[in-house]
A protein has these predicted regions:
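A structural motif corresponding to the C-terminal lobe/cap of the Radical SAM core domain
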Residues: 1-65
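Radical SAM enzyme core and accessory elements
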Residues: 37-250
Length: 250
């Protein structure tokens, strides 16, 4: 009834989408729709809950980031309605590389963290670092867990190889489990982590609210215990078990 009063022009067929108004041009409407798509993909999906807040801090405000991300998708001709989660991660990291190349190591690791919180990916993402330097230590960790059951309650009937298949252990250069504001402060100070952080993802004990895997910061066997090959790094910054359940279900 008020369409004429407000100068609203809309499609004549359902769902009667607004094309423009007295205050918003057609171009403005299209721009807002593209921003809405980015918000749906990267915020409302709750699949990027650690990467997005840190990347967003590099922009004046959230709208500025989603607006620029929408332009990036449009200019590159990327698909918005793709079912592949890895595709969305890859595009977001490409966008981050363009906007803030100095933070890429952290952004990549936050993407890996977000991905493994959601699923025990059988195919390792292309943006994840090579885990071969820690192979022996990871194997040794699961062998010790089979004996002592320190981090995985409820897995008593499974042996080491089964534990390794059913869960995931990732070694990060950054303490990705920390709050976004802590990581943002580290970035702003130009701080480089001196130690690695090993995080265990437990998919049988998920957070009831978010459906994310339960996580624990764990201690990997030392080089002497695991007998790694020359040049392998160790994880020295072990902390107590934590049960973070950040993010939300698909």
């Amino acid at each position: 009834e008020m369409a004429q009063t407000y100068g609203i022009v809309y499609q004549s067929c359902p769902p009667y989408e607004v094309l423009y108004t007295k205050w918003l041009s057609y171009g403005d409407i299209i721009r807002l729709k593209r921003v809405e798509e980015m918000v749906e993909l990267y915020y409302n999906s709750n699949q990027f809950t650690h990467l997005i807040p840190v990347l967003q801090s590099r922009f004046e405000n959230p709208f500025a980031m989603y607006d620029k991300l929408a332009d990036f998708y449009h200019e590159k001709g990327y698909f918005v309605h793709t079912p592949a989660r890895a595709y969305r991660y890859q595009v977001l990291l490409e966008f981050a590389q363009q906007e803030d190349p100095d933070g890429m190591e952290l952004y990549r690791e936050l993407a890996v963290y977000d991905l493994y919180l959601r699923e025990n990916a059988k195919c390792r993402p292309a943006f994840a670092l090579d885990e071969k330097p820690y192979h022996d230590q990871i194997v040794e960790f699961y062998q010790e867990e089979e004996k002592n059951r320190t981090y995985l309650p409820g897995y008593e009937e499974y042996h080491a190889k089964q534990l390794q298949r059913m869960t995931h252990l990732e070694v990060f250069s950054w303490p990705v489990q920390k709050k976004a504001w802590e990581l943002i402060s580290m970035l702003k100070r130009g701080e480089v982590p001196e130690t690695k952080t090993a995080i265990l993802f437990d998919y049988q004990n998920r957070d009831r609210l978010t459906d994310n895997a339960r996580t624990a910061v764990v201690e990997l066997p030392t080089a002497a215990d695991a007998k790694p090959t020359a040049g392998q790094a160790t994880v020295a910054d072990a902390e107590a078990v934590t049960a973070t359940g950040k993010g939300a279900a698909d």
